[in-house]
Regions:
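Residues forming the flavin
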Residues: 1-54, 58-275
C-alpha cells in the first residue's frame, strides 16, 4: 500500500528531487524516509500569469503508511486505493475462424492486439498502406503529387492521428485507461503519458509506437493486411458468414463470423455499405 498526496504544486522547472521534498513536507517526514515518489496526475494551473505551475497527484512509498496518514491530518493525504488491473475476459471461442478487425487506427490496433494476446490469431484489414509507405505517399502529395485515395492523411496504418501532433484524447475515469496507456508506453511512448492531464506522445514517437504495436500483433500470430478494403458482408439471417474484401482491382471472399469495425470517421463508402 502507498500514500496518495493530492494538490502538490511544482514550478515549471521543478524536478523529481523537488517533488520528493514537497511530498516529504506534506507528510511531515524527512526526505530520506520517502522510498519512492510516483506521479499519478499532472495538470497545469495557468490562471495567474505570474504564477504558472503544475498541480500534481503523487503516490508515495513509505513505512507505516496508516500512521503517516493519521499523523499528517490533511485532506490532501490518504491511503492510495488499491489499483484494479485490467484483466482480459476469459476466451471461450469455439469457431475455427479467426476474428477480423477492420481499421488500424488506435481502436483497431488495440482490438487486434488484445485478440492476439488471447491467442485468437486475428486478421487486421487496413485499406491504406503500412506506415512506412504511407508517409512517402503523404509527403509526395504535400509536394504537389497526386492524391492516393487509399493512402493519405485519413487512411493507412495508425489512422488519421498519425499525422497529428500525437495528443491522446482519453476518458480519464475509464478503468481500462491505465491498461491502454501502459500498452502505449510498452510500445515506446513516453512514460509521462501515464500521469499527464493531456497526454502527448509526439508525431515522431507515435509512428514508432504504431509500428511496434503492429509487430507485436504479428509476433503473437496475428495477420496484418494492408491495401485490403472491406467492401461487403454476407449474412445468413442475422449471422455473419462472409466478408468481401477489395485488394486493388481484385475482390475476394473471406469466411468470417466475428468482425470488429474500427474504420475511423472518413470511410464513407464503408458506412454506406453497412446501411
Amino acid at each position: 500500500m502507498m500514500v496518495r498526496i493530492t494538490n502538490l504544486t511544482l514550478p515549471p522547472d521543478g524536478d523529481e528531487t523537488l517533488l520528493k521534498k514537497k511530498a516529504a513536507k506534506a507528510l511531515g517526514l524527512s526526505v530520506g524516509k520517502i522510498h519512492r515518489c510516483i506521479p499519478v496526475r499532472q495538470s497545469i494551473d495557468a490562471r495567474k500569469k505570474e504564477n504558472v505551475h503544475y498541480v500534481m497527484t503523487v503516490d508515495v512509498a513509505v513505512s507505516n503508511e496508516a500512521q503517516v496518514v493519521a499523523k499528517a491530518k490533511s485532506k490532501q493525504v490518504s491511503l492510495r486505493p488499491e489499483p484494479k488491473p485490467y484483466v482480459f475476459p476469459t476466451v471461450t471461442r469455439t469457431s475455427p475462424l479467426p476474428p477480423v478487425v477492420v481499421g488500424s487506427g488506435p481502436a483497431g490496433l488495440l482490438a487486434a492486439l488484445s485478440l492476439a494476446k488471447a491467442g485468437l490469431r486475428p486478421v487486421l484489414l487496413e485499406r491504406g498502406q503500412a506506415l512506412e509507405q504511407r508517409v512517402k505517399d503523404v509527403e509526395a502529395f504535400w509536394q504537389g503529387g497526386d492524391l492516393d485515395p487509399e493512402s493519405n492523411v485519413q487512411f493507412g496504418e495508425g489512422g488519421a492521428g498519425t499525422f497529428s501532433d500525437g495528443k491522446l484524447t482519453t476518458g480519464t475515469h475509464d478503468p481500462r485507461l491505465t491498461h491502454v496507456m501502459e500498452t502505449f508506453v510498452a510500445a515506446g511512448a513516453p512514460e509521462d503519458i501515464l500521469w499527464q492531464h493531456k497526454p502527448h506522445v509526439g508525431t515522431d514517437l507515435l509512428r514508432q509506437v504504431v509500428t511496434n504495436l503492429r509487430k507485436e500483433i504479428q509476433a503473437l500470430g496475428g495477420a496484418v493486411r494492408f491495401g485490403h478494403r472491406l467492401s461487403g458482408l454476407t449474412l445468413a439471417g442475422k449471422q455473419l458468414t462472409e466478408i468481401q474484401v477489395d485488394q486493388g482491382r481484385v475482390t475476394y471472399t473471406m469466411p468470417c463470423d466475428t468482425l470488429i469495425l474500427a474504420p475511423g470517421h472518413s470511410a464513407r463508402d464503408t458506412f454506406r455499405m453497412l446501411r
